[in-house]
Design a protein with these regions (language model features):
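Generic detector of bulky aromatic hydrophobic side chains
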Residues: 7, 20, 24-27, 188, ...
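N-terminal Sec-pathway targeting helices
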Residues: 1-17
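N-terminal export/targeting and maturation segments
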Residues: 20-118
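Alpha-helical interaction segments
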Residues: 6-8, 43, 178-179
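Generic preference for well-ordered secondary structure
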Residues: 9, 33, 44-47, 168, ...
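Extracytosolic and intramembrane catalytic regions of membrane-associated proteins
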Residues: 73-199
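General helical structural elements
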Residues: 6-7, 60, 146
């Protein structure tokens, strides 16, 4: 009986060790790998965007080409969502009512392109109430990048003529006060945040 008891206790201790020590380490390592993969993908996107801007130079063409770039590189399934002012909606009338010529141009260019494209998840919104504290005079086009089965990051392409001034004034571009932006063209910036809950 004592041997069986010893075997049983040993098995219990092994299980406890596995669930308390091994699994958290494996989960942490998986998260680290997912983050590195997201960083690698985002770096590729940033480099490609810079190359697009160098060859194009036109803002609307730049937007459309960057959408095409993601489609060609990652072959995302179709889904298109619109976030005017950070408020979930898919009603174009709500967006078109915004008194911003650039915003409407971006909306028209992207929606026209999206009819024949396949994008995992895209948003465009005028940044007046969005939860990531972008300047109110900016316009944001967001890509949700799938890293693996349950890991996502988002890559925001931002048009903001006064971005540098907002940074000097102490405005932040994520909820934690971190400046994660990278300038990719005149008045265009990329901000990457991850992981991101997929909704």
């Amino acid at each position: 009986m004592k041997k069986w008891l010893i075997y049983l206790l040993s098995a219990v201790l092994i299980l406890v060790y596995f669930f308390i020590i091994i699994l958290p380490v494996v989960d942490s390592l998986s998260g680290h790998i997912a983050r590195k993969e997201a960083e690698r993908q985002v770096e590729q996107i940033q480099v490609s965007m810079e190359a697009l801007w160098d060859t194009r130079g036109d803002e609307l063409t730049f937007i459309a080409d960057s959408v095409l770039l993601l489609h060609e590189q990652y072959q995302y399934p179709t889904s298109f969502h619109l976030y005017p002012g950070g408020e979930k909606s898919i009603r174009p009338t709500k967006i078109l009512s915004k008194p911003t010529v650039l915003y409407n141009q971006l909306y028209n260019a992207i929606t026209q392109f999206s009819q024949n494209s396949e994008i995992e998840f895209a948003q465009i919104f005028y940044a007046n109430k969005n939860p990531f504290y972008y300047p109110q005079d900016s316009c944001v086009f967001r890509y949700i990048i799938k890293v693996d089965d349950d890991e996502y990051c988002h890559c925001d392409l931002i048009y903001s003529p006064n971005w540098e001034q907002h940074k000097q004034d102490g405005n932040i571009c994520d909820p934690f006060g971190n400046d994660l932006s990278k300038r990719v063209a005149d008045d265009w910036y990329v901000v990457v945040l991850y992981p991101y809950e997929y909704y």
